[in-house]
Amino acid sequence: ERSTKHGDFKRTRNGDYIITINKFSNQFRFLLILIHELAHYFVALEFKNSKPHGNLWKNRFRNLLNPILNELVFPRDLLKHLINHMKNPKSSFSYDIELSKVIDKYDLNEKEFSYLDEIDDGQIFVYGDGNKFIKNKKRRKRYLCTNLLTKRQYLFLGNAKVKIYENSSN
């Protein structure tokens, strides 16, 4: 399973279109990503050279999602954030920190984690495949963190799922 993106839309060399979506235990995440990728498909059918997340895509995405933006489909807390998000949809729900966190609430079998923006500066955390980082400071919308092994610095979104490192000796 890809961890860097939830879905993808591609045109093959022979002109066919392919949509791939990761397997999710979260029905709302799956539905939203499917509609996101279908918006790419419909825009590609109609307009050959359009920006991937430009105005054409945003309008098509809104048109596809609006008919189901109601409490029959989405829980009230998620619906509230979705309606706000759809005013100017982003290329990924991950960039809408609050919406992303509400969607996460509906993940089944999710292991325990903390969001990076909920831990203190100076805290050591584990991310991804076990790399240890120290949270430094916020820079605009992202957090500057240092990999303890390589000393390289990385920027993380506040909704990055991390595990607090319990052992104080690195």
Where do the PLM segments sit?
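Active-site recognition of the HExxH zinc-binding catalytic motif
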Residues: 32-45
